Design a protein with these regions (language model features):
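Non-catalytic beta/alpha edge segments that cap or flank active sites
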Residues: 1-163
Length: 163
């Protein structure tokens, strides 16, 4: 069982002006898939705060999988992908590509996602859309291969990608 964190990135959620439904929904999905969700937070759309939370989850807490929800769109304050890429050491472009492909099957607006994913130390970080529906569709599109990716990340070289 791998540890996981869910970070909701929302100015209104942080200020208590909007109820976060995406974060708790992602927590439930992760638990159903066998993850141990050990950390959750709600932070504003502030680049430095996003980076600090991601680094904390990776470097201090040693969490295997970190999901963010929110801040991946076109609004001027949507800077989650940029903050994540500031601290990611090894990009994993196939994950957001798969999420966008699945989203495009549902709506042409799926191409507007700016989600990114990558590895920092031994933590896989995936940025998801802010809506409950889109974040659920996106994570369900990739969670099974992500679990295998974590097996490889934690295997010390003994896991086979072809399996």
């Amino acid at each position: 069982m791998y540890t996981a964190a869910v970070i909701t990135i929302s100015d209104k959620g942080y200020r208590g002006e909007r109820v976060d439904t995406s974060g708790p929904n992602l927590v439930e999905i992760l638990k159903e898939k066998g993850f141990d969700v050990t950390y959750t937070s709600i932070i504003p759309d502030e680049r430095e705060m996003i980076k600090e939370e991601l680094v904390k989850c990776s470097d201090e807490l040693g969490i295997a999988l970190v999901l963010t929800t929110g801040g991946t769109g076109f609004s001027p304050r949507d800077i989650t992908p940029e903050a994540a890429m500031d601290i990611i050491e090894r990009p994993t472009p196939g994950i957001p590509e798969a999420m966008r492909a699945e989203s495009m099957r549902i709506t042409p607006k799926g191409c507007l996602s700016r989600s990114v994913a990558g590895i920092r130390k031994r933590t896989l970080i995936i940025t998801l859309p802010g809506s409950k529906k889109a974040s659920q569709e996106n994570i369900l599109a990739v969670i099974d291969p992500v679990a295998h990716g974590l097996d490889m990340l934690y295997s010390e070289g003994s896991a086979d990608c072809a399996k």
